[in-house]
Amino acid sequence: VFFTGLIDAAYSGASSVVGPAVWGIGGGAPLLAALVFVSVIFFSSLFAVLHHTGVVRIVVGAMARAMAKTMGLSGAESTSAAANIFVGQTEAPLLIRPYLPKMTTSEIGAVMTVGFATVAGTVFGVYVTMMKDVMPGIAGHLLAASVMSAPAGLAIAKVVFPETDKPETLGKDI
């Protein structure tokens, strides 16, 4: 309900800028490009504000510590996995950028696997927008799926790429 309310507010603001015809008000179908662009811009802006205020760091840090302790992961791969739940595959590795050159093959495999397993926040918004009329509780289902996919992706990555070296960030908070 919270995410759908945010998206509805974004669309009502955007319709006042570009006009109601783009949104299908008055009988036409809404333009897919308009739906996608508004979702991408809105969620990018929302995550930028949350990152600037430190909310993202707190939430991602707590999740990363929990994953590192329960799954025996290094700080870099658990931080990237936790960030992948909220941001995309291109943004999450930027949080661990200084550690990338020294990461083991297993850690890099885990970062890539979790990136493919989770849904980026902007894409999350697009999916909710497209599916909210067909499946009213879609936001909760997608969020639960993304949260469950991070540890599942890590487990699969460790089976495919077992850790043979000692990671530099093992036991460290990033």
PLM regions and their residue ranges:
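Membrane-embedded alpha-helical segments and adjacent helix-loop junctions characteristic
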Residues: 1-84
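Long, contiguous bundles of hydrophobic transmembrane helices that form the permeation core
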Residues: 147-174
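Alpha-helical membrane-inserting segments
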Residues: 46, 50, 124-128, 152, ...
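Alpha-helical transmembrane segments
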Residues: 38-44, 137-156
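Membrane-interfacial segments
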Residues: 57-58, 63, 99, 132-133, ...
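Alpha-helical membrane segments and immediately flanking helix-loop junctions
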Residues: 69-131
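Membrane-interfacial helix-loop-helix connectors in multipass membrane proteins
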Residues: 127-141, 168-171
